[in-house]
Amino acid sequence: MGTRDYENFKREVNSGKRVTYIKLRDFQILENDSYPRREFREPRNVTINNDNTISFDVENWTTFKSQTVTVNVSEIDSFSF
């Protein structure tokens, strides 16, 4: 995600807009989950951290429990509101 996209993303999230989709550049294997993913639909509790990372909660497809994912801003390919 470029600087301009990040600033727009940050402004929208901080204004309370709900993120509906996040796509990463590479696949992530979540802890205790056997399904690598790079697309996350309906992430919850999206948080912009001070260290150029973004955290959000998703459902783990193996345990069916909520799990927090933290990624660097540069790992985000696209997003939707």
Where are these regions (language model features)?
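Short glycine-rich, low-complexity segments
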Residues: 1-31
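Short, exposed beta-strand/loop patches in secreted or surface proteins that constitute
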Residues: 11-13, 43-48
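Residues that act as N-cap/strand-start positions at coil-to-secondary-structure junctions
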Residues: 16, 38-40, 63-65
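Short, surface-exposed beta-strand/loop "edge" segments at domain boundaries and coil↔beta transitions
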Residues: 27-33, 61-69
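Short, contiguous, helix-prone interaction/anchoring segments in small proteins
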Residues: 29-41, 49
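Structured surface patches comprising rigid loops and adjacent beta-strands/short helices at the edges
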Residues: 46, 61, 68-81
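Short connector loops at helix/strand junctions that flank enzyme active sites
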Residues: 49-51, 66
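Basic/aromatic-rich interaction segments and small domains that mediate binding to polyanionic partners
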Residues: 52-61
